[in-house]
């Protein structure tokens, strides 16, 4: 394992974390929108 390999792995891990974070944020927003629609219907 060279330093370049470790650096590449670090970048990939960061990208995966960002993708996971954006997925979580998007799903949270969708849940909030669904709740708003339900409360508006009542």
UniProtKB/Swiss-Prot annotation:
Source superkingdom: Eukaryota
Regions that span the bilayer: none
Principal subcellular localisation of the protein: cytoplasm
Subcellular location: Cytoplasm; Nucleus
One GO biological process term: negative regulation of conjugation with zygote
Keywords tagged on the record: Cytoplasm, Nucleus
Further comment found in the protein's record: There are three genetic loci for mating type genes in S.pombe, mat1, mat2-P and mat3-M. Cell type is determined by the alternate allele present in mat1, either P (plus) in a h+ or M (minus) in a h- cell. Mat2-P and mat3-M serve as donor of information that is transposed to mat1 during a switch of mating type.
The protein's role, per its UniProt record: Mating type proteins are sequence specific DNA-binding proteins that act as master switches in yeast differentiation by controlling gene expression in a cell type-specific fashion. Required for meiosis, but plays no role in conjugation.
Name recorded for this polypeptide: Mating-type M-specific polypeptide Mi
């Amino acid at each position: 394992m060279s330093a370049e390999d470790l650096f590449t792995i670090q970048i990939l891990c960061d990208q995966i974390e960002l993708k996971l974070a954006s997925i979580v944020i998007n799903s949270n927003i969708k849940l909030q929108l669904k709740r708003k629609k339900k409360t508006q219907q009542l």
